[in-house]
Amino acid sequence: MKITKIETIRLQSRATLIWIRVHTDEGLVGLGESWFGCAAIEADIHDRVAPALLGQDSSRIEALNRQMRPYVGFTGTSAEMRANSAVDVALWDIQGKATGQPLYAMLGGATRDRIRVYNTCAGPDYVSKSSDVRPGNFGLDRETTQRGKVFDDLR
């Protein structure tokens, strides 16, 4: 599967978050996410990452990560690292969709039945205050998430 397009999605209502969609020639789309310094992340995605990855095989995740790594700066706001991370998440999303497997299975299998949900970076209103503590889709439409909600499967 070749990467045909990499796009960024930013919402005014979530100014500290950015989503990345990686498209393939087989119609699969992977969704990744990052935070903080979204303008710098977006510029890095479009100026550095997309030109390097377009036309590449999306299943070669580690090779693509190594290809992006030499350009990473480890000082400042680390926008490059966060851009790479978002693309990595999107590539794993594609791989899971292509194989019909959840990420935990591709990485060696489950080690526990459930995990706690936590929020490290997006602020206290990231998770809804509803009784079931489930986040919404943050204004992303069904086409963007391909499942209706970004976190549809949280328990």
Report each predicted region and the residues it spans.
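Short, Gly/Pro- and small/polar-rich lid/capping loops
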Residues: M1-R21
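Short clusters of small/polar residues that mark proteolytic maturation junctions
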Residues: T8, E33-S34, A122
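Metal- or metallocofactor-binding catalytic centers and their adjacent structured scaffolds
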Residues: H23-T99
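Active-site-adjacent beta->alpha loops and helix N-cap segments on the catalytic face
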Residues: M106
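Subtilisin-like serine protease catalytic core
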Residues: G109-A110
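Metal-dependent enolase-superfamily TIM-barrel catalytic cores that perform enediolate-based chemistry
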Residues: R114, N119-R155
